[in-house]
């Protein structure tokens, strides 16, 4: 993924304002609610039977924060996403057998969460930059599958 210096600036400036725990938990929670088939990878998380159960599930919130911390690693290494996510790609492919399409879904849900949290501060240019980033992360996570 090629990001201009302006796009990198938009990503890093917004990243500094994100509440990792809240936004990460919300993004993973939304993924599980909007795309319920993704919950099969989280059977060990307990009750995921309703939107309320998902959004109140401590394991969902904690794992969502962990996922967003990984996005922080991406932001620190925007020019080497494949290298940054090599081990996670291997884990998700070889051990967890996650459908790589789910990485794209999560990225898009994250962008929706950012738009909701930041409103008009999440400009079209910011969305373009973040869409490129989440696509790059999804690609890097899917790398081991190819």
From Swiss-Prot:
InterPro entries cross-referenced by the UniProt entry: Globin, Globin-like_sf, Globin/Proto, Hemoglobin_b, Hemoglobin_oxygen_transport
Positions bearing Phosphothreonine: 12
Cellular component, GO, one term: hemoglobin complex
Positions bound to heme b: 63, 92
GO biological process: hydrogen peroxide catabolic process
Alphabetical keyword list: Acetylation, Heme, Iron, Metal-binding, Oxygen transport, Phosphoprotein, S-nitrosylation, Transport
UniProt entry tagged with the keyword Transferase: no
Domain of life: Eukaryota
Any one GO molecular-function label of the UniProt entry: peroxidase activity
Pfam families membership: Globin
Domain Globin: 2-146
Residue ranges of the TM segments: none
Family as reported in the entry's similarity comment: Belongs to the globin family.
Function: Involved in oxygen transport from the lung to the various peripheral tissues.
Protein name in the entry: Hemoglobin subunit beta
Organism: Potorous tridactylus
Name of the coding gene: HBB
């Amino acid at each position: 993924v090629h990001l201009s210096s302006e796009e990198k600036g938009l990503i890093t400036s917004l990243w500094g304002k994100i509440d990792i725990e809240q936004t990460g938990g919300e993004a993973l929670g939304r993924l599980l609610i909007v795309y319920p088939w993704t919950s099969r990878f989280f059977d060990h998380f307990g009750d995921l039977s309703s939107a309320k159960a998902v959004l109140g599930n401590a394991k969902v919130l904690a794992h969502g924060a962990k996922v967003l911390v990984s996005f922080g690693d991406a932001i620190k290494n925007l020019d080497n996403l494949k290298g940054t996510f090599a081990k996670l790609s291997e884990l998700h492919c070889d051990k967890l057998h996650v459908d790589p399409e789910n990485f794209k879904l999560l990225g898009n849900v994250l962008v929706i969460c950012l738009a909701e949290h930041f409103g008009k501060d999440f400009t079209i240019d910011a969305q373009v930059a973040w869409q490129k980033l989440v696509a790059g992360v999804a690609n890097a996570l899917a790398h081991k599958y190819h």
